[in-house]
Amino acid sequence: MCFEIEGAEVARRTLERFGMEAGAVDRSAIAIILHMQPGVTLSDGVEAVLLDRGTAIDVRGVDIELVERLRTTVTRTYPRGAFDRHFLRAIAREAAKRSDCQSHSFLHEGDLTGWMARSPWAAEATRT
């Protein structure tokens, strides 16, 4: 099972355990499943758009100017450390097992490693 599906199931169980309303649980699970798919729009739900855009900022540095004034404070409080290395290792493990997962196409057809290396966050990781 692809990690976005696994993550959605873990989130679903956790949110249900905390008593979240069923519709909100479903929207959260769908957002997690869709967050690595290209072309997420408001028709997919506000949660999906926010998670998609947040992931783009966090992993690739897309639209980093939206959080630029907070970046130093955030990385000082929550150092990224070896996040990039660990994240890429996890993606590579999944891609090696499951060529039908989105992680496989990001790693082998996209430029995930390059995106992350060029991200403004990469420079922060070297300072923490």
Task: Locate the predicted segments by residue.
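Acidic/histidine metal-binding catalytic segments
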Residues: 19-31
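Histidine-centered active-site/metal-ligand motif
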Residues: 1-3, 35-36
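Divalent metal-dependent phosphate-bond-processing catalytic cores, especially two-metal-ion Mg2+/Mn2+ enzymes
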Residues: 20, 37-128
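A broad detector of short, well-ordered amphipathic alpha-helices
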Residues: 5, 9, 27-30, 52
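An active-site-proximal "capping" alpha-helix that borders the catalytic cofactor pocket
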Residues: 2-18
